[in-house]
Amino acid sequence: MAQESWKNESEETVHTPEAPILCVNNCGFFGSSMTNNMCSKCYRDFVKVTTMAAPVVEKKAFTPASSSKTPLEPAKPDEVPAAAVEDKQAAQEPPKPPSNRCLSCRKKVGLTGFQCRCGGTFCSTHRYTEAHDCTFDYKKAGRDQIAKQNPVVIAEKINKI
């Protein structure tokens, strides 16, 4: 009797493993139920295709901020914004190639040239402001930088009692 109860318990607890499932795409590899019966490579390709095919697009409806009916004045065609004129002039001028010669002695500097704040490129002997008569005002630039970094704080006057 003990053997019969032991036999019934073992039959209930023993589960036969499922046979491996081949990939749905018939690539020869085994698939998984977690990946829709596809192998890892086919599933990765499937996810790529589905995300590319249906990109998420959010359409925002335009709603006016105020419902007031104020008439708008049409722009005059004769007036052209100043920014547009400057853009046209900048587009007409071709960009200058970077200078690879010293502005003082015209010596070729190549990649070893020093850029100055005045806008020029100089060799190792003319890189200092005294050597090339620099037009940039370093003192004023320093004062402006300090003034910008340390704003003036004015305290309120104290009322005497």
From Swiss-Prot:
A zinc finger (AN1-type) spans 96-142. Keywords: Metal-binding, Stress response, Zinc, Zinc-finger. Zn(2+) 2 binds at C102, C105, C123, H126. A zinc finger (A20-type) spans 17-51. Gene3D superfamilies: 1.20.5.4770, AN1-like Zinc finger. It comes from the Eukaryota. InterPro entries: AN1-like_Znf, AN1_A20_ZnFinger, Znf_A20, Znf_AN1. SUPFAM superfamilies: AN1-like Zinc finger (SSF118310), Glucocorticoid receptor-like (DNA-binding domain) (SSF57716). Induction: By cold, dehydration and salt stress. May be involved in environmental stress response. It comes from Oryza sativa subsp. japonica. Zn(2+) 3 binds at C116, C118, H132, C134. GO terms for molecular function: DNA binding; zinc ion binding. This is Zinc finger A20 and AN1 domain-containing stress-associated protein 9. Residues 62-99 are annotated as: Disordered. Zn(2+) 1 binds at C23, C27, C39, C42. Residues 75-90 have a biased composition (Basic and acidic residues). PROSITE patterns: ZF_A20, ZF_AN1.
